[in-house]
Regions:
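Phosphate-handling catalytic cores of nucleic-acid transaction enzymes
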Residues: 1-232
Length: 232
């Protein structure tokens, strides 16, 4: 599931998928993995997302170079006060929308600890309905505008958002119990591919690390190659 979420992020700015000539949509994915603590969620994501992190480092270097030189062809990415990002782990909906509008238009919202997402990003209280509405539209790459009191208006179009969340069952159950069925009623959970694998805690036998990770290296190489095809 982690590989699928990362892969969708790396190609979502390049293609659409068509079930028929009238039903065309993005290849972005919303993925939710329900796992116990200790299942190596963070380690797996770190390994699988190396291509995304490398692309962010490249963007940071380009941004740094632009800030030093302040010359050459101007682009909206490097005129910003902060480097552009692809990966977001802790952001409000308003902050995420503004980042997409002014920076990279193909991004990943991810967390190996579901509490970061379900406990943040405006997913509680009065902000919850607005957050779910935003994410529901983003799943289908639907154009949307956001206007909030004491906040700058944001308009999103031609963007892509994938979500890759790993969480403990207790975190999700607590969040669902507090939002009075709003997430289910608005179809938020229906947009996710939900994975609940069997626990391997207590059954994992130690194996010496391999000298080479050829398949993982090829995956990372392909991810980075696609991310460099800039069509944001």
């Amino acid at each position: 599931s982690t590989a699928l979420g990362v892969a969708s992020t790396c190609v979502q700015h390049l293609a659409l998928v068509a079930r028929d000539h009238q039903t065309v949509g993005p290849v972005s994915l919303f993925v939710l993995s329900v796992l116990r603590s200790g299942e190596r969620k963070s380690t797996i994501f770190r390994k699988m997302s190396e291509g995304i992190w490398e692309m962010q480092r490249e963007l940071k270097e380009q941004w740094d170079h632009y800030q030093e030189e302040k010359q050459g062809k101007l682009t909206h990415l490097f005129e910003r006060d902060i480097p552009p990002k692809i990966l977001f782990e802790d952001a409000t909906v308003q902050g995420l929308a503004k980042e997409i509008e002014t920076g990279i238009r193909s991004v990943l919202m991810s967390s190996s600890e579901g509490g970061t997402v379900f406990g943040g990003i405006g997913m509680r209280g009065e902000a919850l309905m607005g957050a779910l509405a935003f994410l529901n539209k983003a799943w289908d790459a639907e154009a949307q505008s956001m206007t909030r009191k004491q906040a700058v208006s944001t308009y999103l179009e031609f963007y892509r958002l994938s979500c890759l969340i790993s969480s403990q069952r207790e975190t999700i159950q607590e969040w669902l119990s507090k939002n009075a069925g709003l997430a289910e009623g608005m179809g938020f959970l229906a947009r996710f591919l939900i994975c609940v694998p069997e626990s391997t805690i207590g059954y994992r036998i130690y194996k010496q690390a391999p000298d080479a990770t050829t398949k993982l290296d090829r995956f990372t190489e392909q991810c980075l190659k696609r991310l460099r095809q800039k069509r944001y």
